[in-house]
């Protein structure tokens, strides 16, 4: 199960494209509404979360995903985010974040000494991460980071490959006519 954490102000592309890749691969997902049951994107679109933070049971967690955008500030100081990150660190689940959201992982020490990418606007918030400036997506151990909206499809395909293998990711690539 991939738990997708939604906050008001998330970047639309950074949430939709990776989830589309996961869906095409048949990977189950649950949307967790961090800032409420109804979440509003940067562009004003609303989605309904599947569960609230109080309903979250991580026992079947394979990966957590934090979409970025201007709403990234809404991840900080949220007990559900702290709990999910701690669970992933303890159980070695994957953690994926894109754009500004890798700064949330950095603030929790997850990226200390790890290679990572992020949106340039949060470079100074990346702590002891080893920033990879020429990459769209970076994988280091159980952490997957994407640099921004332009990396959304590639991040989603990388998530599929890590969870279900190269063949599953290639099938999705072919299905969307991806040439990257």
Q: What are the language-model segments listed below?
A:
Residues 98-99:
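Short, thiol/selenol-centered motifs that function as redox-active sites or metal-ligating centers
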Residues 110-111:
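Conserved hydrolase catalytic core segment
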Residues 120-122:
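Long, charge-patterned amphipathic alpha-helical coiled-coil/hairpin "stalk" segments used as oligomerization
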């Amino acid at each position: 199960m991939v738990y997708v954490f939604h906050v008001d102000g998330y970047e639309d592309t950074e949430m939709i494209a990776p989830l589309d890749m996961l869906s095409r691969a048949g990977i189950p997902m649950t949307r967790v509404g961090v800032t409420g049951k109804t979440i509003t994107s940067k562009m004003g679109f609303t989605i309904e979360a599947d569960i609230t933070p109080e309903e979250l049971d991580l026992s079947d967690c394979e990966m957590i995903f934090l979409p970025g955008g201007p709403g990234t500030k809404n991840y900080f100081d949220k007990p559900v985010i702290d709990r999910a990150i701690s669970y992933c660190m303890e159980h070695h689940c994957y953690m994926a974040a894109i754009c500004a959201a890798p700064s949330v992982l950095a603030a929790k020490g997850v990226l200390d000494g790890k290679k990572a990418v992020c949106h340039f606007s949060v470079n100074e918030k990346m702590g002891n991460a080893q920033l990879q400036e020429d990459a769209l997506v970076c994988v280091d151990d159980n952490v997957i980071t994407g640099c921004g909206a332009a990396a959304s499809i590639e991040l989603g395909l990388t998530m599929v490959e890590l969870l279900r293998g190269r063949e599953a990711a290639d099938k999705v690539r072919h299905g969307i006519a991806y040439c990257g």
